[in-house]
From Swiss-Prot:
Localization (cell): Cytoplasm
Protein name: Serine O-succinyltransferase
Organism field: Xylella fastidiosa (strain Temecula1 / ATCC 700964)
Reactions listed under catalytic activity: succinyl-CoA + L-serine = O-succinyl-L-serine + CoA
Pathway in which the depicted protein is active: Amino-acid biosynthesis; L-cysteine biosynthesis; L-cysteine from L-serine: step 1/2
Superkingdom of the source species: Bacteria
Length: 370
């Protein structure tokens, strides 16, 4: 499977060798990123966005890529993250297949695809790689560091590993460690991929591709990204029309089933299964408590920033609202002026992507006050 790189992507060559937290190193690796706005003369107006597991760095359209990005309504001139004021960077995570080096990339040493020879990936590796991009752009300190979902974990790792790198932080639907429920879901997703007979210990190709496994993994993910409240409102128990069903025993019958099938079918042709495995496991491993002898609040208190906003949705079952509350509590313990905000968005974990009316104003207010 090839990589899926958006047009207009920029690339930073990582230091070589690039050491990985859990052992191993990368040679001649790179990070894909995109930028919006203009960096001021003092390089004091920069914002770094760290995305979730599956997005690329194309958060919004720009001159080199007119396609709408995954956070189009949040980022741009006059929008909550106002590019008339801020110079915004979005980095594609190390280990992804959207431009940054990952299992789907070619190893320059062996001239073969990394596949499972890619070193074990940690959230901290993505954090260190992202900061190389920031420094390469001539930025010593970010005005703000924004992380959502997995990116919220990466942002916390950045703040722990690189003190004074940011003056403020917005953590959106993120967490300081993976909870058992989230680990269990991701374990099932990985199992679905690995049990697909076409996975072949990571040695699949376009002809023999673990599509069924990745499709099931994505369906499991989508179920947890939204909420039962939204599923009820959007689909209820509505059945498919007769021309949308077939005679397959136990086949698709309800609209919700058809939605999951269509969504997953689109996804499997835009993401590499091995990259999914690596990024998924990196989230399970991340734990701020490791930085303070098992005390997660003490670990968060080690972070030194001026201001922070932790925001999430009460209907999020993957990164429950108490995890954002915990982030704010821990940061306050360390002296940060931290605010927690829980929203009643029905869209669950994905609310930050679609409920811009709910998430946009507090983000804008926070940034306007910097």
């Amino acid at each position: 499977m090839t990589e899926f790189i958006p047009p207009g992507s920029l690339f930073h060559a990582l230091s070589s060798p690039f050491a990985m937290k859990r052992g191993g190193q990368l040679h001649h690796a790179r990070i894909a990123y995109e930028t919006w706005g203009r960096l001021n003369a003092g390089a004091t107006n920069a914002i770094l966005i760290m995305p979730g597991l599956s997005p690329n760095a194309h958060a919004a359209h720009h001159d080199s890529n007119a396609e709408p990005g995954w956070w189009e309504s949040m980022l741009g001139p006059g929008k909550p993250i106002d590019t008339d004021r801020w110079f915004v960077i979005c980095v594609n995570s190390l280990g992804s297949c959207k431009g940054s080096t990952g299992p789907a990339s070619y190893n320059p040493i062996t001239q073969a695809m990394y596949r499972l020879d890619f070193p074990a990936l940690s959230i901290e590796d993505g954090a260190n790689a992202a900061i190389e991009v920031v420094h390469a752009l001539g930025i010593k300190q970010l005005a703000s560091l924004i992380g959502n979902s997995m990116g919220g974990m990466t942002a916390l790792a950045i703040l722990l590993l690189h003190p004074d790198i940011a003056r403020s932080h917005i953590n959106i639907s993120g967490s300081a460690q993976a909870l058992p429920f989230s680990i269990a879901i991701r374990s099932l997703q990985r199992e679905a991929i690995r049990l697909d007979p076409h996975w072949k210990q990571g040695h699949y190709d376009d002809t023999h591709y673990p599509e069924s496994g990745l499709r099931i993994a994505r369906k499991l993910g989508v179920i947890t990204y939204r909420s039962a409240l939204e599923w009820d409102g959007r689909f209820g128990r509505v059945r498919l029309d007769s021309d949308q069903t077939n005679d397959t025993p136990f086949g698709l019958e309800f609209q919700i089933e058809n939605y999951l099938e269509s969504h997953a079918h689109r996804f499997v042709h835009t993401f590499d299964p091995n990259c999914y495995l690596y990024l998924s496991r990196s989230m399970d491993w991340f734990d701020v408590a490791e930085y303070a002898n098992g005390d997660i609040i003490a670990g968060l208190a080690r972070i030194r920033i001026q201001r922070a906003l932790a925001i999430g949705s009460h209907t999020d079952i993957l990164f429950p609202i108490q995890q954002q509350q915990q982030i704010a509590e821990g940061l306050r313990r360390g002296g940060t002026h931290a605010t927690f905000l829980g929203l009643d968005s029905p869209q669950g974990h994905d609310a930050f992507l679609v409920d811009i009316a709910g998430f946009g104003p507090p983000v804008k207010e926070f940034l306007d006050e910097l």
